[in-house]
Amino acid sequence: MNIGINGFGRIGKTIFIQLLENKLVNIKAINIPGFDINNIKIYLENDSIHNYNKSWNITINEDNSFNVNEKKIYVLNNRDASLLNWGQYNINYVIDSTGAFLTTDSANKHNVDYVIMCSPPKDNTPQFIYNVNHENYNGERIISNASCTTNCIAPVLKCILENNEIENASFTTIHATTASQNVSDT
């Protein structure tokens, strides 16, 4: 399975780290608009949250790619999904962690077989949460994995609902700022 990752912030980077050593998956390219590939090694090695695997040998190539051990991964630089030529790298699955392509129509611009959104959609794109409703997946080309908050609370609520009734619920989520949010330092 050949994967492309669109967006390389906290979610995209975490997905990259988790999938890199999966033998069933080949990460062929990541799209990081405005990113200098020469910083990729520093970006991966210096993460105070997710420690990278110290056995990784990261090298930068001259063709806008880098290697992690023997795996070659291209770095793309485009905000327009319709201009990303994922097919050039034989990519058939794109994991979109940008939060920018949140409708089936906009996700279709990736022009690949399957797209997984890492945010809740803004239309009726189906949402699947593992251990909640993933068994309802029926081959849809474009899906959403909902939000990180939903992925945290939905399995807990499902467990409670299997044996109890919930009249109402309240929870608080504390979330890191995202790239699109302004941080006020007063």
What are these regions (language model features)?
Residues 1-183:
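N-terminal Rossmann-like NAD(P) cofactor-binding subdomain of oxidoreductases
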